[in-house]
A protein has these predicted regions:
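Transmembrane-helix bundle segments that line or gate the permeation/cavity pathway
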Residues: 93-98, 249, 262, 281-293, ...
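Hydrophobic core segments of alpha-helical transmembrane domains in multi-pass membrane transport
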Residues: 25-38, 57-66, 86-95, 122-131, ...
């Protein structure tokens, strides 16, 4: 029924919107392919690669914003996002033409051209606009305050006082090297996170979420408070291949929350269990959340070493969650799901090799000491 409704909604869309969505998907697919090729053949000049990565994703981000605003008939926002989308394309071209010059440029004393200043300002502004749209004002305010502190640190009293950077030096550090905007964060997202996100999306698209839900039902579905325990187990398993709490909620929550409510849990408790269970995916090896890649980059530790030390944390996290669910089920007198309503174990694990083999390859390569990029690419 949902598939039929989705097909009907797509058929009722204006032709221009269908074309725009199709072009966006092609652009996203090309971006994924480009990252896979770069992971295989090498990234080349780090500065140019990171700048290209950021330019492409700014283009995709504002293209999506533009499509959404056009669909909502918001003329002013559409015009603004159209400008940002166009400038993101110009930014991509700029880095292809000027990337080598900026790479070879001597910091602080090298020449700075007006076009460099223009794209430096645009890059910072575009990032702030995207952050405001997806996260909100608090993160934007934090970024702006930190930039102002870097510039006017001499006005701050006490231990936080420093001489301050001039605007020209601030521009040099933040935009014209691999220490600012194009520093460790962009390095991690462009080389590691993108590959693991693609890996998780691929497994999800070929039916991993259905397998996980059925497998979790077979494991704990009949136990006391079974539906809520299924939510915890399925979120833990999905977190192993995704690591993204939001994707975890969307994928497993659509199935487990209605099941929990139907079995007798309150709306608040059902939502809380799914939120907590999905958040735990960020600390569940081997993929975990994006933060672990930054930790690995900053501390200089192997990703596999960090992941192995998080196993106990993840186990304790989900054991505590299952214990809490069991206590709530005991308090309310809730039983598990009748076995005849659950999928059979043989049916649940049928075709599991499609997910287990690539996942096993990923885990093996990380344990064997291969680089994170190679492990993600092989998976």
């Amino acid at each position: 029924m949902d598939s039929l409704n989705n097909n009907t909604a797509v058929a009722n869309e204006p032709k221009w919107l269908r074309i725009a969505n199709l072009l966006f998907r092609y652009a996203a697919a090309a971006t994924a392919l480009w990252h896979l090729i770069k992971a295989f053949v090498g990234v080349g000049t780090p500065y140019v690669f990171r700048a290209t990565h950021l330019s492409i994703f700014l283009f995709l981000t504002f293209s999506l914003f533009l499509i959404e605003s056009l669909k909502a008939r918001q003329k002013v926002r559409s015009a603004i996002y159209a400008i940002f989308t166009t400038l993101a394309i110009a930014m991509l071209v700029y880095f292809q033409l000027a990337g080598e010059r900026l790479t070879m440029r001597i910091p602080i004393i090298g020449d700075v051209y007006p076009i460099d200043i223009f794209f430096a300002i645009f890059t910072a502004l575009a990032i702030l606009v995207a952050i405001k749209r997806k996260i909100g004002w608090p993160m934007v305010i934090i970024c702006v305050v930190l930039v102002l502190y870097t510039r006017y640190g001499y006005l701050v009293p006490g231990y936080l006082n420093h001489k301050g950077y001039s605007w020209s030096r601030l521009l040099d550090v933040m935009f014209m090297g691999i220490e600012g905007i194009f520093g460790s964060t962009i390095n991690v997202t462009s080389r590691y996170i993108i590959l693991f996100v693609l890996f998780g999306c691929l497994l999800s698209k070929i039916g991993a979420s259905d397998f996980i839900n059925n497998f979790a039902n077979c494991l704990v579905g009949t136990s006391r408070g079974g539906p809520a325990k299924v939510s915890a187990v399925s979120s833990a398993l999905f977190g192993m291949i995704s690591g993204a709490p939001t994707a975890n909620v969307v994928t497993t929550g659509a199935f487990t929350i209605p099941m929990m409510k139907k079995s007798g849990y309150s709306d608040v408790f059902s939502g809380a269990v799914e939120a907590v269970a999905s958040a735990g995916g960020a600390i569940t090896p081997p993929i975990m959340g994006s933060t672990v890649f930054l930790v690995s980059e900053i501390l200089g530790l192997q990703y596999s070493e960090i992941a192995s030390r998080c196993i106990l944390c993840a186990v304790l996290y989900y054991v505590a969650l299952l214990w809490m669910i069991d206590l709530e089920a005991q308090r309310k007198g809730l039983l598990g799901t009748p076995r005849e309503q659950l999928p059979r174990f043989r049916e649940a694990v049928k075709g599991a090799y499609v997910f287990v083999i690539p996942f096993g390859i990923l885990v093996y390569m990380m344990i064997a000491g291969y680089t994170t990029t190679m492990a993600g690419l092989a998976g």
